[in-house]
């Protein structure tokens, strides 16, 4: 694999992304549902795109979340929904949309108690932890992330009650319903104001990081690592798990 000519160099100013332009495009661009590239398209359990080209906007996120609200009972989830976001700028904007739709639909969202980023494994573990001794009112989750995609990209994926990636039967149902809503100009989407949603009883703080880190020694021999007196250097490179290493 060829090494990029800019590998190992500082970011150039001309490569910076325009946050104001991204935010404006996210909130004001309405996708052309006749264009396949602007429809909701689920890949590995989620939808990814850019606000600038009309493939990841507030309309997309709202429609996807309403679709989840419409179908999650069929997927076996009637309890809370765990929400995590990564470090991409669009994730911050989409996070507000997610809470607005969930709260308007009366779905309880468990969010990070200190407003930190939440990596996918932590959301998966939270779902399993919650569901482990329950037979009903099971939880599912949403992770707001385009994974490894560039900084100007956004994404969102759904994890069902199993904690892992959603299967094609689930993603197809969400995709179809979301596109139906988009075709109707999201008239079937329930939303409330961002501030109202955050202050509602449907948004509940949850200690993702503390609980996840505390459970690591149940699967990792921490004493052996300490006794080996290894010196380990970690660079999270802007990943959403960066603060998990500190803790």
What are these regions (language model features)?
Residues 2-38, 134-135, 154-247:
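Gly/Ser/Thr-enriched, mixed-charge loops and adjacent short helices
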Residues 20, 82-153, 247:
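N-terminal small/polar loop signature for handling phosphorylated ligands or for N-terminal nucleophile
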Residues 31-44, 48, 71, 76, ...:
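N-terminal glycine-rich anion-binding loops that anchor highly charged ligand groups
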Residues 37-56, 146-149, 236-244:
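Conserved phosphate/anionic-ligand binding catalytic regions in large, soluble enzymes, centered on
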Residues 46-61, 198-206:
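Acidic/glycine-enriched edge-of-secondary-structure segments
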Residues 56-66, 90-91, 115-119, 205-213:
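Phosphate/oxyanion-binding active-site loops and adjacent basic polyanion-contact surfaces
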Residues 58-65, 71, 85-104, 230-247:
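Glycine-rich phosphate/diphosphate-binding loop of Rossmann-like nucleotide-binding domains
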Residues 65-81, 189, 221-228:
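Glycine-rich phosphate/diphosphate-binding loops that line cofactor/substrate pockets in enzymes
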């Amino acid at each position: 694999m060829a090494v990029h000519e800019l590998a190992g160099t500082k970011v150039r100013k001309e490569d910076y992304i325009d946050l104001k332009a991204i935010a404006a495009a996210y909130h004001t661009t309405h996708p052309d549902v006749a264009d396949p590239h602007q429809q909701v398209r689920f890949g590995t359990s989620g939808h990814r795109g850019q606000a600038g080209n009309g493939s990841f906007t507030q309309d997309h996120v709202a429609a996807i979340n309403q679709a989840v609200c419409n179908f999650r009972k069929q997927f076996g989830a009637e309890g809370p929904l765990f929400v995590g976001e990564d470090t991409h700028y669009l994730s911050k904007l989409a996070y507000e949309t997610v809470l607005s739709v969930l709260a308007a639909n009366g779905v309880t969202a468990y969010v990070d108690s200190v407003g930190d980023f939440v990596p996918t494994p932590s959301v998966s573990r939270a779902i399993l932890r919650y569901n482990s001794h329950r037979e009903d009112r099971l939880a599912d989750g949403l992770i707001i992330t385009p994974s490894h995609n560039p900084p100007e990209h956004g994404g969102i994926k759904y994890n069902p009650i199993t904690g892992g990636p959603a299967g094609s039967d689930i993603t197809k149902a969400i995709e179809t319903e979301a596109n139906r809503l988009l075709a109707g100009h999201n008239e079937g989407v329930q939303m409330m104001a961002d501030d109202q949603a955050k202050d509602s009883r449907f948004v509940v703080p949850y200690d993702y990081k503390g609980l996840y880190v505390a459970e690591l020694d149940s699967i990792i021999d921490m004493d052996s690592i300490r006794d080996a007196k290894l010196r380990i250097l970690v660079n999270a490179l802007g990943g959403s798990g960066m603060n998990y290493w500190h803790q």
